[in-house]
From Swiss-Prot:
GO terms for biological process: ribosome disassembly. GO terms for cellular component: cytoplasm. PROSITE patterns: G_TR_1 (PS00301), G_TR_2 (PS51722). It comes from Moorella thermoacetica (strain ATCC 39073 / JCM 9320). Pfam families: EFG_C, EFG_III, EFG_IV, GTP_EFTU, GTP_EFTU_D2. This is Elongation factor G. Belongs to the TRAFAC class translation factor GTPase superfamily. Classic translation factor GTPase family. EF-G/EF-2 subfamily. Keywords: Cytoplasm, Elongation factor, GTP-binding, Nucleotide-binding, Protein biosynthesis. It comes from the Bacteria.
Amino acid sequence: MAREYPLEKTRNIGIMAHIDAGKTTTTERILFYTGRVHRMGEVHDGNATMDWMIQEQERGITITSAATTCFWRNHRINIIDTPGHVDFTVEVERSLRVLDGAVAVFCSVGGVEPQSETVWRQADKYGVPRIAYINKMDRVGADFFRGVRMIAERLGANPVPIQLPIGAEDSFQGMVDLINMKAIYYTDELGTTLDEEPIPAEMEDLVQEYREKLLEAVAESDEELMIKYLEGEELTPEEIKAGIRKATIAVKMVPVLCGSSFKNKGVQPLLDAIVDFLPAPTDVPAIQGVDPETGDEDERHSSDNEPFAALAFKIMADPYVGKLTFFRVYSGTLKSGSYVYNSTKGRRERIGRILRMHANHREEIDEAYAGDIAAAVGLKETTTGDTLCDEQHPIVLEAMEFPEPVISVAIEPKTKADQEKMSIALQKLAEEDPTFRMYTDQETGQTIISGMGELHLEIIVDRLLREFKVGAKVGRPQVAYKETIRRPVKAEGKFIRQTGGHGQYGHVIIEIEPQEPGKGYEFVNKIVGGVIPKEYIPAVDAGIQEAMANGVLAGYPVVDVRATLVDGSYHEVDSSEMAFKIAGSLAFKDAAKKAQPVLLEPVMRVEVVVPDEYMGDVIGDLNSRRGRVEGMEPRAGAQVIRAHVPLAEMFGYATDLRSRTQGRGTYVMQFDHYEEVPKNIAEEIISKRQGA
């Protein structure tokens, strides 16, 4: 079957935003106007098409990014709806990795909120071209221009409005199109009929000022346009659009539009902007990768004629078809029923069926082409971030990095019968979500689950009950402490056993030293002259890592250490991998005790929005939680307090803040960094752990 839409007419985009900016509503309206949905879904009613997991409909937030295909002006648009809640940054990170462009939705009242900053930084990391859509122009306190200013100041971007709102709050009627210089009014309830009229007289000066800014930005993107502009010639709408497209794709400019998705105003021009300004797969650079056989760098261009290469970016358990693997095809084509090579795992797998997803219904397709986003049924071994490719031309695409979980809870099944079901279910959930981990605590035998925040773990427990019918009891949340060392130390590990026949002999001398925070573990082998045979070196490394899983202070994992194997000895007969593994482990434990071990705790970036009269009280409370207040700023009749607070002090904060501010305060927090726990508190934690 030939491809329906040429690559140039394909757009792979994400819709990203803060939690309440109206992202899901905007996506719903896009699906309505592009004809995929016959009745608009409302998040308020809990029936939005994209939010198809039951938990999402109840909570009114988007948790998993559903991929949907729709059509506008003879273009195919694949949309990935991403969650805006900080506990789900992994979903955002995954979807940005496979997108070519994005629409950032902002609330006209809140402007740039903390989650918008996080998502924006993630998009910067992957160099994703963006257009901004300032939504909720009908709300009290709507301020388009403040939104634009905040995009520049807080995100360090170059926002250039290509529309200006006509009116605001309840008098918001439409917008001025600065490219074609006309006013657009919405006349019917559903927003399907647009009236074009001359620009209102009272807006002429403002329009002129912003038209000038737009022309300047466009001229800067292209030398020919710059010459034309400087010579005072009029630029045609086509030239302006071409200039905006060029600057947007080069991530030198962010075109800004406005609207009110809920009131059905502004969505069609947004669709036009997606088609006009966001890149096709052919506009973005070739995807980089590595040839797994030679280790050489390699790349794949967006073309059906190159060897097949795709990235699996999401795994979902589907009640009807089993495991669904969402993937983005970067090059080549893939037929259903064919075999692919998973180069990350070095395994060959068979693709059963290929599905194109529309929020929660699906159509089966025979073949996926370069630039497509689709879901495969039948891949057993593939997990998030794996590369699928042609076995004759293997390539490993750069995988994604996911943040470490910061919060853990002990979980136990309500009945004996649930025990086995629970571990299978948790295993499946961990496959879907790389920021969710499960392990068994060696000392207590409890099952511990860890994730990115309280909401994240709540939803996991909720899914256990609904999808897997496993009842579970959850303990109190625990902080994921870590340990590290503060000074370099040399130590020796000897494991010698003489029993009848073969004995055991392993002897190593290692040096350990602190690495800078976040650098992780590094093993360096400096053995020369074969004092320890080559085949035993990996065993020493494994032994050290095993010892690092349980630190010397309180049994927490040790991080940011470089271990160097400098010397040792072996025995012709008695040495074995096992003996060297134990020697490595003993050496590390001994070294860590002498290397000034310290306890680290996760510190969160917290942003609290409260009415003025509660500000003093809330700041006092943050200080009492060992918080450092970094700054404050007024926002729409309230105060925004930014602070860094240890996670250990933030449990139950939501309830506390509600009672302190009579339900008027809100807050968001996300992981920022690890830092050393103050001595007196560290002693308490250690004695509790040892007492347990």
